[in-house]
Design a protein with these regions (language model features):
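Subset of outer-membrane beta-barrel
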Residues: 1-325
Length: 325
């Protein structure tokens, strides 16, 4: 879940945006830099019903050592009714997922940086709980003079140590991503593209009860397909494309498209704006604000809000000189 609003507005990925936004390190730790030092940020999403997402982060750089950050992600599912096999309510319980992250990045030179994130994962539903650890690693090539950034990220290398019921340990969703962004000197926008799940070719959801469907379950019509159509459908599910329009140096408009989200969450006869996202951001002195509007499925919209501040880059105005009489 792309909690930071800027990431949500850009379709769910921001692994190749190296600037003063500490939230981009949520997906790629190599994006930490001196510009994110002394930055603090908080994000919030009100999801379906009483489900709420939150994320807090803080970054600090140390000369000749590197760039550090810490983040805490929380998914709260509210109060849920507990029922027996006959549907009778037996009480209530709560559910939460937590992710505590420690991030580090180092600048190899003026162009190349690399970073690592160590995540501690904790999940609890009623009396059932699970604990795990995972590592993310990223490398970024940033050519500031050409306004070009290229990144590769490996996510969720880890293990579940404690399972909910004492059964077999579950695998973590390992992912390899490639991303690039390019801003044009004479145009007020940057183009952003991410290739998701480089390690898995076929991301199409397969129903275990009907692994090779020939009839559309909603329309009852035969599914017409060709090898070429299948290829481009599978290829499209890997790509997230977006643009960020730089209206002024302190105001931005964002738009993203996630084909995989559109195909998985839309209805066959009503796709609407599923998979589209958009938003804006602006800065006032040391503070920055971002808002995102995401349409994961027809009939439902998700709103994201991020508020942050960078205390390292803010300096007070000098005192006026007093001329001696």
């Amino acid at each position: 879940m792309p909690i930071p609003a800027r990431t949500a507005a850009l379709g769910g990925s921001s692994i190749a945006l190296k600037d003063d936004d500490i939230n981009t390190a949520f997906q790629n730790p190599a994006l930490l830099s001196e510009k994110t030092s002394n930055s603090i940020s908080g994000s919030y999403i009100n999801f379906l019903g009483s489900v709420n997402y939150g994320y807090l982060s803080y970054g600090k750089s140390f000369k000749n050592i590197g760039h550090f950050a810490a983040g805490l992600q929380d998914v709260g599912y509210g109060t849920i009714s507990a029922r027996d096999e006959y549907g009778n309510q037996t009480g209530t319980f709560t559910g939460n997922d937590y992710n505590f992250s420690l991030m580090y990045a180092y600048d190899h030179d003026s162009l190349l940086s690399y970073g690592v994130t160590v995540k501690t994962l904790y999940s609890k539903y009623a009396q059932y709980s699970s604990v795990g650890n995972a590592i993310d690693a990223g490398i970024t090539y940033n050519k500031a003079s050409k306004l070009f950034c290229l990144s590769a990220v490996m996510q969720n290398v880890g293990k579940e140590w404690k399972t909910y019921t004492g059964g077999p340990q579950e695998k973590l969703p390992f992912n390899i991503l490639l991303g690039a962004s390019k801003k044009f000197k004479r145009a007020p926008f940057r183009l952003i593209a991410t290739y998701d799940y480089l390690n898995i070719w076929n991301l199409t959801y397969t129903d275990p009860n009907n692994p090779t469907p020939t009839v559309d379950p909603f329309t009852n019509q035969p599914i017409k397909t060709t090898p070429v159509k299948n290829f481009f459908d599978k290829l499209g599910r890997h790509f997230i494309v977006a643009t960020e329009v730089v209206v002024t140096k302190n105001f931005f408009v964002r738009l993203g498209f996630n084909y995989k989200m559109r195909e998985e969450l839309s209805l066959p006869d009503k796709k609407g704006l599923a998979g589209l996202s958009g938003g804006f951001g602006f800065k006032i002195n040391r503070f920055n604000f971002s808002y995102a509007f995401t349409r994961p499925t027809p009939g439902y919209s998700m709103n994201s809000l991020t508020v942050g501040a960078n205390f390292g880059k803010y300096t007070k105005a000098p005192k006026p000189l007093v001329m001696p009489l």
